[in-house]
């Protein structure tokens, strides 16, 4: 949103901000969504936005491979998003190793799976706002963030005036309310608009009184970064009771995850 038509500038922000909490595929998810947002400002072709945005991702990565599969399955089953969804589930949706909650259970928030659900909605939604968010929601898993991304990208492409009236009517109720005690929708929009104008000028474009000229950027792949390489689950142990003194845990491997709750005098966290 801050870098309209400037994919590589958007990816640079993702590099610095995304690496605070993610790396590898987790980082690429942000890069890809940012690239599609950036392209949505300058193109009305959703397939172009999906495929051109993918050029910001290194071809050797799992994320690139998964998105490429979805694009190819869309070509193979152009009228059946559920068939494409089944293919995603069979090949990519089986096991989450990045989030401990998803190991060996039917729960998967791997970034490439959620990226697949975003472009599933975009490709099969065919420019229809409600259809797009419906498909990304029904795909499952992280089903609030994914339709927010697919709907946001498509909404950027369409522009505010082309959004369905029933959604715009409801926005008026909440657009000045701070979200989780941070900023409101209107304030966030104002900040993003100002940042975008600054970015356009910084990257060689021009900002006039009634128009802007953007120095369009062709996507350049981000550096290759492989997350959780060679990592697999060896053992999962459940201790279904309270432990007053946590014991020493010995293991052979490269890491361990300990999950539980801390019980205090007045609360559990």
Placement of each model-derived feature along the sequence:
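Substrate-binding/catalytic groove segments of enzymes
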Residues: 5-8, 162-164
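A broadly tuned preference for mixed-charge, low-complexity surface segments
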Residues: 47-61, 163-179, 202-210
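Catalytic phosphate/nucleotide-handling subdomain of diverse soluble enzymes
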Residues: 25, 33, 117-200
């Amino acid at each position: 949103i801050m870098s309209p038509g400037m994919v590589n500038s958007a990816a640079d922000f993702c590099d610095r901000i995304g690496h605070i909490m993610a790396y590898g595929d987790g980082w690429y998810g942000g890069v890809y969504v940012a690239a599609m947002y950036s392209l949505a400002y300058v193109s009305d072709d959703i397939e172009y936005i999906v495929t051109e945005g993918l050029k910001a991702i290194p071809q050797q990565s799992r994320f690139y491979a998964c998105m490429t599969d979805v694009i190819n399955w869309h070509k193979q089953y152009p009228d059946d998003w559920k068939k494409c969804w089944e293919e995603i589930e069979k090949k990519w949706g089986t096991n989450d190793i990045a989030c401990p909650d998803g190991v060996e259970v039917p729960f998967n928030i791997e970034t490439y799976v959620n990226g697949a659900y975003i472009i599933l909605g975009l490709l099969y939604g065919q420019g229809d706002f409600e259809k797009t968010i419906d498909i990304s929601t029904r795909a499952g898993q992280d089903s609030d963030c994914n339709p927010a991304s697919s709907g946001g990208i498509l909404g950027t492409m369409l522009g505010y005036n082309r959004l369905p009236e029933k959604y715009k009517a409801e926005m008026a109720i909440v657009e000045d309310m701070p979200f989780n005690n941070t900023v409101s929708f209107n304030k966030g929009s104002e900040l993003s608009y100002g940042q975008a104008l600054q970015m356009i000028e910084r990257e060689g474009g021009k900002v006039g009184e009634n128009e802007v000229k953007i120095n369009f950027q062709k996507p350049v792949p981000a550096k290759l970064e492989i997350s959780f390489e060679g990592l697999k689950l060896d053992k999962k142990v459940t201790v279904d009771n309270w432990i007053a003194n946590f014991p020493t845990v010995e293991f052979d491997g490269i890491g361990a995850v300990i999950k539980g709750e801390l019980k205090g005098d007045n609360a559990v966290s």
